[in-house]
Amino acid sequence: MNDIKQLLWNGELNVLVSIDPSFLMKGSPREIAVLRIRVPRETYLVNYMPFIWNKIKSFLSFDPLTDSEKYFWFEHNKTPIPWNYPVGVLFDCLAGKSATFTTSFENQVKDVLTFLRIHLVMGDSLPPTIIPIASSKTQAEKFWFHQWKQVCFILNGSSKAIMSLSVNEARKFWGSVITRNFQDFIEISNKISSSRPRHIPLIIQTSRTSGTFRISQPTISMTGVNPTLKDIEGDILDVKEGINGNDVMVICQGIEIPWHMLLYDLYSKLRSFDGFLYITLVPIKGGDKASSEL
C-alpha cells in the first residue's frame, strides 16, 4: 500500500501562474508576469508564495508583505479558487468543469489542461468563502494542522492522538510536507490514523458548469460496516436534484474510481496529505441530469 501512497506523494503538476498587472510597475517586462512552476499534488498553492514574491519582487509596485489594505487570492478563468485545498484536488475539479467527459478522465485531462492555470489577483475586499493569502509563513501550517485535528476526531472520536504528538514530532510532520520526506510523513500520520475508524473524513466536490464548486462533507459511519461507494451513493450525490451514479464519474487523486470500491480501502490508499479523502464528481456527457444540474 505504501507504494501507492508514495506514487501519489511524488505526483506533480505543471502550474502556470499569471500575475495581475496591478502588482507590477509600469514598464515591467511582460515575461515577468508569467511563472511556470512544478508543484506536488500533495501541497498547498500558498506554500509557493515566497517563491512567487521573490521572482517578481524587483518589479512590484508595492510591498505585499507590509500592505495591510490589500487582499490577495487566486483565480481560474475569473473564478476565485481556494488555496486551502490540495493542489491536486483543485486540478481535478477545474479539469472536471472544463469539459463534460465522454472518454477516460486521464485522457481528457491531457487535452483540457496542460497546465493548472491560475491568476494571482488583489482587491480591497475578498470574494465570499475565500481565505486571504497572508504574509505569515505559518498560515498554511496552522490551517493544515487544524485539518488534521478534525481528521483525528472524525476517525477516533477524539483529537487525543494528534494532541499527544511532541513538539518535535509536530514540527517533523509539517516539515515532511515542505521537504517532501515521505517516510517522515507516513511515520507521523500512522500515529493519528485508525485501522477501525468510527467515521471516514470525506469531502465531496462537484464540478458545476457555472464554474463554481459545490462542497459537501457527509458523515459516513464505519461502525461494524465497510461500505462501497455504491452503498453510500445517496450520501455522495445530491439526490434531491435527481442526480444518480450514471450521471457522474467519481474522481480521486486524478483517478477514475469504480462505484464498487470499498470506502475504507479508498481512504487508506488515496487520502490526501491533510488526512481527508477528496472525491470529485465529474458530469458525464449524456447523463440524465448531469448537463443541466451540475
Curated annotation (Swiss-Prot):
One of its GO terms (molecular function) is Atg8-family ligase activity. Keywords: Autophagy, Isopeptide bond, Membrane, Protein transport, Transport, Ubl conjugation. Conjugated to ATG12; which is essential for autophagy. Conjugation with ATG12 involves ATG7 as an E1-like activating enzyme and ATG10 as an E2-like conjugating enzyme. It is a peripheral membrane protein. GO terms for biological process: autophagy of mitochondrion; cellular response to nitrogen starvation; piecemeal microautophagy of the nucleus; protein transport. GO terms for cellular component: Atg12-Atg5-Atg16 complex; autophagosome; mitochondria-associated endoplasmic reticulum membrane contact site; phagophore; phagophore assembly site membrane. Gene3D superfamilies: 3.10.20.620, Autophagy protein Apg5, helix rich domain, Phosphatidylinositol 3-kinase Catalytic Subunit, Chain A, domain 1. Its main location: membrane. Belongs to the ATG5 family. Conjugated with ATG12. The ATG5-ATG12 conjugate forms a complex with several units of ATG16. The ATG12-ATG5 conjugate also associates with ATG3. Small amount of ATG5-ATG12 conjugate is enough to perform normal autophagy. This is Autophagy protein 5. It comes from Saccharomyces cerevisiae (strain YJM789) (Baker's yeast).
